Regions:
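Well-ordered, non-membrane alpha-helical segments in soluble/globular domains
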Residues: 16-28
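Polybasic, proline/glycine-rich intrinsically disordered low-complexity segments
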Residues: 54-106
């Protein structure tokens, strides 16, 4: 199993109200310039938020939800501080409820 860290909020907040796209674009460029594999993803309607251990968090976030998930704890901490009004947490995946950490609902 791998520990994934995340921030989550409504899709509208993460994709329209916060400059998240610019932050992620810059990070992708930095990774490319330094030959680092991408270890973060933005997910719309992420299934991992429905895991039983995140049930309370899932119910607090307006739908549709969005999240940035990563194996890099420092990056998610940075995003949490930068975006401020987001939920955050961590989760071991895959687990008995979810095999694909990047799975999304249609």
């Amino acid at each position: 199993m791998t520990t994934y860290y995340f921030i989550a909020a409504s899709q509208k907040f993460l994709t329209k109200e916060e400059p998240l796209e610019e932050i992620l674009k810059e990070r992708r460029r930095n990774y490319k310039d330094n030959n680092i594999n991408i270890d973060f993803w933005i997910l719309i309607k992420p299934q991992f938020l429905k895991c039983s251990e995140l049930k309370d968090l899932y119910n607090k976030i307006p739908t549709p939800q969005a999240a940035v998930i990563s194996t890099d704890k420092k990056f998610i901490t940075f995003l949490k501080l930068r975006c401020e009004f987001v939920a955050h947490g961590e989760l071991e995946l895959p687990n008995s409820e979810l095999s694909d950490p990047l799975a999304v609902d249609e």
